Each structure stands twice: as structure tokens, then as C-alpha cells.
Amino acid sequence: MSNKIQRVRGTRDLLPEDSILFRFVEESAYEKALLYGYGEIETPIFEFSDVFHRTLGETSDVVNKETYDFTDRGGESLTLRPEGTAGVARAFISEGMMQNLPLKFYYSGPMFRYERPQKGRYRQFYQLGAECLGYESPLADVETISLAWDLLKKIGISDDCTLEINTLGDAESRAAYRDTLVNYFTAHKDQLSEDSKMRLEKNPLRILDSKDEGDKKLNANAPKLEQSLNQTSQDFFKKVIAGIEKLGIPYKINDHLVRGLDYYCHTVFEFTTTKLGAQGTVLAGGRYDGLIETMGGPKTPGVGWAAGIDRLADLTPKELATKKEVIIAVVGADEQGEDESVKVAHEMRVRGFKTENFLSGKMGKKMQKANKLGAHYALILGGNEVTNKTVTVKNFTTGEQKEITRAELQTYPFSI
């Protein structure tokens, strides 16, 4: 290992220029969530390991290969959260919120997975999500998808995204499909990867998620879930599709889109893009009516989605995130001016203007820095201005320069 101090592999430093896009995505999501009646929730970045083992499944790649697990000094087995839904579900149970249904939660924050780092994928990544608990109606699925679509429109990437949607049916339909899959894959067991042979015993639907090329060939000819759907499941999905069409959200049905865990049911969906190479999914979600019960709580219907902020920010046009605001530079021409500049800069910030105060250096250099910063105005202070209680205002756009009183400065009409 090099002696040079460096980032841990799979992490990133979010520098100021990147933070502009990142913050824009977060603020846009928060704004849209509030419009849909969601309240913000913050859960710890680590939980008891069992929280994720129960929700993600002992056979999942996340639990087996990707979680950051550790034992604390008290001997407790803890895990850095690999996703946000489990923490929200745990909070719902442990905080006794069952009597307050229906509930809608919005969250954002860092998640952790030991994955192979690549474009758009990090070992510490940032995610935002929405969880709607207490509604059995397919209209809740429609509204959840609508929230996601509105966010993608707000950040300017909806034209590059495709909604892919499918149904998993209810528990009865899934059980029938499971039996059909077991029969199909058992007949081709010798062609399955080792991982999928294990999945065949514990959770055959996970084979459909396999990245192994041999498994993919088998999956192409596997029975389709729609062949196992009962009438109740078909009707539920028809209402979801009708709702999406009523809202004018473009979509395509992807019958290969599944979730391997038993608590998922009915609607599953993803928004995908071709702009990020192999990592095409930017937002994914679905209905999980069995999740709370799996964790030891009461049977509670739920539907939600999550999105990687890193990926959304990579797609967002920079001009959308750049605020059109007046930028003021305060320039002290000499020592007296520099001493007074702190007060003038404070007054401008109180008025709500973005203000940069150059605290040292020659005046010429300060003016160059102000120009490079993109300042629209410079407020120049020298000994004469301090004595006369004035300030010289320079408009970088027009080149106009004039001296005004400090009293006039308090209401001066700065504009772009």
C-alpha cells in the first residue's frame, strides 16, 4: 500500500462543483415528496444485522457478498445499511406507528455495499426514497410512480428515462409460478450456475435475476409469470396501468422484471436509461405487502421506491441546478477598507445576496478573482470610502462604476 493518503476504493469526495447538482437533486426530491404529503424520516446508518437479513433474505447477494458487517464492543452484530426501506420498516415497528396509518415517508442519506466499483456505482453511495404504508389500493402504486416521474421531470431527465413495469401477482399467483419455475429449472439443473442451483432450492425467482450468461439463456425460455396470475392479480395490474395511462406517463411492460423476496407482490417497476452504460437503472420500486410482517410487525400493505442520488446527479443538466442569483464581491482597497469589508459583506448577506469577501491581497488581484468568480458587482472600499461612509459600486456587466452612501447601499437595486 502506498504511503500517500488516499480515498478508500469505491468512495468519492463530493467537491463543491459536484455538490451543486447533488443538492439540487436532493432538494427537488424533498420538494416533490412534500407536495405528495410525505414526511421526512431519518434512520441510523447502521442497524442490527438481523434487520437486513430478514428483509433482504439470507440467500441474497447483498447479504452474502455485499454488506459491511461488524461486531461492536458490546458484542452486537451490526450492519451498515445497504438500502433504506428496511430501516424505515424497523422504525415503523419499533416506534409503534401502527395506529397512525396510512403513513408516507421520504428519506435520503448514505448507503453502503461492497460492490465492484464502476461508473455510477460506489461502495458508499447516496440514496433517496419514498415509502407509502397502509394502502392496499392499486391507486397507491400509481401515485408512487407519479411522484417518481415528477421528480425525474423536475431534474430534467425524464426524456432520457423509460418506465419498465411488471406484476408479480398476489401470494397465490406467486406460489403457482414458483412451482412452475422449479419444474422448468429442475429439468435444466445441469446447465445452471452453482449460485442458481442453490437458489433453486431456496428461492427460484432469484434465478431470473442472475447475471450468469448460461442462466440468462435458460431464463429467456423460462415460463412467464403472467401465465400463473389469478383474476385478482390481473385486475390489480390493469388498474395500475390504467392509472399510469391516465397520468400520461409513458411505459413498457417488462415481463422479466421480478423481485426474488416473498414479501414483494403485485407491482414492480424501474426507470431505466441508456445514458449510464451498464448501470441503466436510476430508480426502482414496487409493492411489498409482506415486509412489515416478515420483520415481526402486523400485516401492513406498502409500496415505495428508491433512487441513487449519484446517478441522478450524473444525468441532471448542470444549467438546471445553477441558480440565477446576484453575486457580490467585496474588495478592500487598503487596510482600512479590508477592516470595514467584513461589516459590508455581512450587510449584503443579511439582504440575501451571495457575497464573497476577499480578505487579503492586492486590489488588482482581488478584482481578477471577483471576475473569475463570476461576480456581478464589486463593492470597493478604501480609506476615503471608510471616512466618507460611502462605497464604490462596480457593475461587471456594464462596466459602470459609481460611489454611493452606505445608507443607499442598504436598498441599492442589485440585479443581473
From Swiss-Prot:
GO molecular function: ATP binding; histidine-tRNA ligase activity
Keywords of the record: Aminoacyl-tRNA synthetase, ATP-binding, Cytoplasm, Ligase, Nucleotide-binding, Protein biosynthesis
GO cellular component: cytoplasm
Pfam families according to UniProt: HGTP_anticodon (PF03129), tRNA-synt_His (PF13393)
Catalytic activities: tRNA(His) + L-histidine + ATP = L-histidyl-tRNA(His) + AMP + diphosphate + H(+)
Source domain of life: Bacteria
GO terms under biological process: histidyl-tRNA aminoacylation
Top-level enzyme category: ligase
Location in the cell: Cytoplasm
Cleavable signal peptide: none
EC number annotated for this UniProt entry: 6.1.1.21
PANTHER family in the record: HISTIDINE--TRNA LIGASE, MITOCHONDRIAL-RELATED, HISTIDYL-TRNA SYNTHETASE
NCBIfam families documented for this protein: hisS (TIGR00442)
Family to which the UniProt record says this protein belongs: Belongs to the class-II aminoacyl-tRNA synthetase family.
Quaternary data: Homodimer.
Protein known as: Histidine--tRNA ligase
Gene behind the chain: hisS
